A protein has these predicted regions:
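Outer-membrane beta-barrel porins/channels
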Residues: 1-273
Length: 273
């Protein structure tokens, strides 16, 4: 909200300038201890309403309406302590910045699974963008510490409302069973990160949206997994490859997994890595 700048109303509390000739409040070459602490917390939840059905046990259809919520809080404190005596007994400064973000949104997901045969299925799903309405508040304060007194100046609270539209996602999947003992499944996920957009009635996000479109791209993510069933013991393995969301970047991320499961007399034990 502040473009990483300090509200001009806070400047007098720094005591770093004078309306006449410059007078330093700190000795030249004095030692200073600079520290910065950032504490943050947040969460995201989603309430969903789903509906599903089948046609002749061959085609399975499903749809979901999601209502996600998010919240985020951050407190940043920058402190500068003067470790030596100063001209005016100045001991230090601190800058406190507080950011609070809350939002709610809506999205739709739909999909279908087709059973080609008893042992082979294919499926597809489409996840719409999530349309978030977000509210943010930002405040800052400057504290100046002298040996004889302290001074504090608090900036006016800044409030901002905007819309965030997240990328859409499509998933294609297939699974097959071989000889009743081997299960093989694969997913192809397509995500267009360049679709992300910001909108606001009080601010023109044209340049930010252009930067998003120029910096991000559509990416393909691939996952494959297998399970071998030895009656009471099951062996599992998986592999994933995620493409880079950034343009002009060939980076990709790979993942591997192994697992074993035990099922005996209604007791289950699963170990995975």
């Amino acid at each position: 909200l502040q473009n990483n700048t300090i509200d001009s109303s806070l400047n007098p509390q720094w005591y770093l300038y004078d309306n006449g000739n410059y007078i330093s409040h700190i000795k030249n070459n004095s030692n200073k201890l600079q520290t910065k602490n950032i504490s943050s917390s947040g969460s995201q939840h989603e309430f969903i309403v789903s509906l599903g059905g089948s046609l002749n046990e061959k085609i399975y259809l499903g749809a979901t309406i999601g209502f996600p919520t998010l919240n985020y809080y951050e407190l940043s404190v920058y402190t500068e302590d003067v470790l030596e005596d100063t001209i005016n007994n100045l001991e230090g400064f601190s800058l406190e910045e507080e950011l609070s973000t809350n939002g709610d949104g809506i999205n739709i997901k739909g999909g279908a699974i087709i059973r080609i045969s008893e042992n082979f299925k294919i499926g597809a799903s489409l996840h719409s963008p999530t349309y978030f309405n977000i509210e943010e508040s930002y405040t800052s304060a400057i504290n100046t510490y002298f040996s004889s007194n302290n001074y504090t100046e608090i900036s006016p609270s800044n409030y901002f409302k905007y819309e965030l539209i997240t990328p859409w996602k499509g998933v294609f999947s297939a699974s097959a069973i071989f000889n009743k003992y081997i299960l093989l499944s694969a997913d192809l996920e397509i995500v267009d990160y360049s679709f992300t957009k910001l909108n606001s009635a009080s601010y023109d996000f044209r340049y930010e949206n252009e930067a998003i479109q120029n910096s991000y791209q559509k990416t393909n993510n691939f996952r494959i997994g297998s399970e071998i069933n030895f009656d009471e013991i099951k062996i599992r393995a998986g592999y994933s490859k995620y493409g880079s969301p950034y343009t002009n970047n060939d980076f990709y991320q790979e993942g591997y997994s192994l697992g074993i499961g035990l099922n005996k007399n209604n007791y289950f034990l699963d170990i995975a890595y």
